[in-house]
Amino acid sequence: MEYEAVADLAPDRRVALFERDAGVDAVRSDVAEILDRVESEGDVALRALASEFDDVEVGNLDVTDEMERAADAVPDDVYDAIEDAAANIRAFHEAQLPDDWRESFAAGRELGRRFRPVRRVGVYAPGGTAAYPSSVLMGVIPAVVAGVEQVAVATPPAETINPVTLAAAHAAGADRVYQVGGAQAIGAFAYGTETVDTVQTVVGPGNKWVTAAKAEVRGDVEIDFLAGPSELLVVADETAEPAFVAADLLAQAEHDPNASVVAVTDDEATAAAITDAVAARLDDRERADTIRAALDNEASGVFVARSMSEAVMFAEEYAAEHLSIQASDDEALLDRIDSAGSVFLGGYAPVAAGDYAAGTNHVLPTNGTARVTGGLSVDTFLRSTTVQRLDREGLAALRETVTTLADAEGLEGHAASVDARFEDE
């Protein structure tokens, strides 16, 4: 891994860095077929697809009853860690809850907003034999905090669903758990089957099949966003500890061979030290092949900027899922960067802390969509409704404005609906 100069980036290199996509086009037609099967065949399709894709003959699709047993079965230290993480995530998301409000804006005119949760949510949690309890916690807890009536989890089927995943669903407060994976899980949530209830909102990370399915069903249900492989961008200055930066890059790279990991600094010696630290630690990692592939990704690299202003511009254009700022003036730099899914300030805020237990959510926008949206939060599950109360005095004050604008738009009935309330004058 060699460092590069930002100023020398060729146009095609810039495209690879700044115009990333989720890579779903290649599977769209296959995903559409899967969704059609789920919509038309229901549980029959879910069982057939489990056999086809997961090599599992599924009996009960609903494994809700296994949650409590799993919580008792996992090692105490694991369940304690799940509960500790859940408590932190819950506290942070409870702090996000908005209050209903109503205020007087003029005599006789009150305006306000109220917030109500959607009723049913589906959370996709990757992994069948593998365990991703953190994804369960991150998806379920904000929905529960928002007041959603029914929160269901779907996770890929296995001969035995990993008890850690089920234990996390129990700790998070999930109401249902289904052993359904991939695009078919998204279809089941969107269209319903004999076993799986339809939901109003589908959230959670997944592979390109899951992402393509979410794109297809958007409109039938609400979704969080279309997420791609994991991303990290580190902004570092000469005070950054290269070993810390390298450790963070390697940690994110182990997610996926398509993950994108980037460091940008205004100090060439720091860039060289980071690349050396990455190389020194790479071969010792259990997932070295995956990490190596991610480091070779066209959207990955270590870059030297001519100034910290250029580094900031690079970070803003990249709009990373995870942004780490390891620099002496990290708060000042943060004020200059608007586009990032989640920000980690200082050398002792590794992304792994946010991934698991700091309390913030790790379901975040990727592929530059942090320019236009934020990560999963309580707001994802809330609907806001505006409220207005006018008395006669309040409407009288607005009467001329409303009727004039209604007449200008040729909507005579709108004007008449106001005038009708003053016919006794």
Curated annotation (Swiss-Prot):
Catalyzes the sequential NAD-dependent oxidations of L-histidinol to L-histidinaldehyde and then to L-histidine. HAMAP family: HisD (MF_01024). Pathway: Amino-acid biosynthesis; L-histidine biosynthesis; L-histidine from 5-phospho-alpha-D-ribose 1-diphosphate: step 9/9. Keywords: Amino-acid biosynthesis, Histidine biosynthesis, Metal-binding, NAD, Oxidoreductase, Zinc. GO terms for biological process: L-histidine biosynthetic process. The gene is hisD. Binds 1 zinc ion per subunit. This is Histidinol dehydrogenase. Zn(2+) binds at Q252, H255, D355, H414. Substrate binds at S230, Q252, H255, H322, D355, E409, H414. The keyword Acetylation does not apply. One of its GO terms (molecular function) is zinc ion binding. InterPro entries: Ald_DH/histidinol_DH (IPR016161), Histidinol_DH_CS (IPR001692), Histidinol_DH_monofunct (IPR022695), Hstdl_DH (IPR012131). The active site is at E321 (proton acceptor), H322 (proton acceptor). The keyword Amino-acid biosynthesis applies. It comes from Halobacterium salinarum (strain ATCC 700922 / JCM 11081 / NRC-1). Its cofactor is Zn(2+).
